[in-house]
Regions:
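Catalytic core of pol beta-like nucleotidyltransferases
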Residues: 2-48, 56-63, 72-129
Length: 129
């Protein structure tokens, strides 16, 4: 398999090129989305899950992460605590970013016209709720 050699400071890294068919990569990503979302539903009991970012747009690559927006009533006050709580519960084989909002926070941000959340609603895929 061919790859590219990169030097960062004094350490040399070899980055293998992904030589798999796009359909195979897409199927692996879809399986991981289903795996993670089913775990979130079973273990975290959210009101809603929205997939957003490159995976929702069908543009994910092997280097992409998965982005999930989750709405849940009973979550810790601080955002970092919410992410920590969720991250402990979910087994995954790919990089994942979670955004967790309480329903009232979600509604308030939408009413304020939050452009990022509007984009998530426009381009994201509702997986649950």
């Amino acid at each position: 398999m061919f790859g590219s050699l990169q030097t960062i400071d004094t350490v040399v890294y070899f980055k293998a090129l992904k030589c798999r068919p796009k359909i195979e990569i897409a199927m692996d990503i879809q399986k991981e989305i289903e795996n993670i979302s089913s775990q979130i539903i079973a273990k975290y009991k959210p009101e809603k899950i929205i997939l957003f970012g490159s995976a929702a747009l069908g543009k994910a690559t092997p280097e992409s992460d998965l982005d999930f927006l989750i709405i849940k009533k009973d979550t810790p006050y601080y955002g970092a605590d919410r992410i920590r709580e969720l991250s402990r519960l979910i087994d995954r084989n790919i990089a994942v970013d979670f955004l967790v909002y309480r329903p009232e926070e979600w509604e308030q941000r939408l009413k304020m016209g939050d452009p990022f959340l509007k984009l998530i609603l426009l381009e994201g895929k509702i997986l649950y709720g």
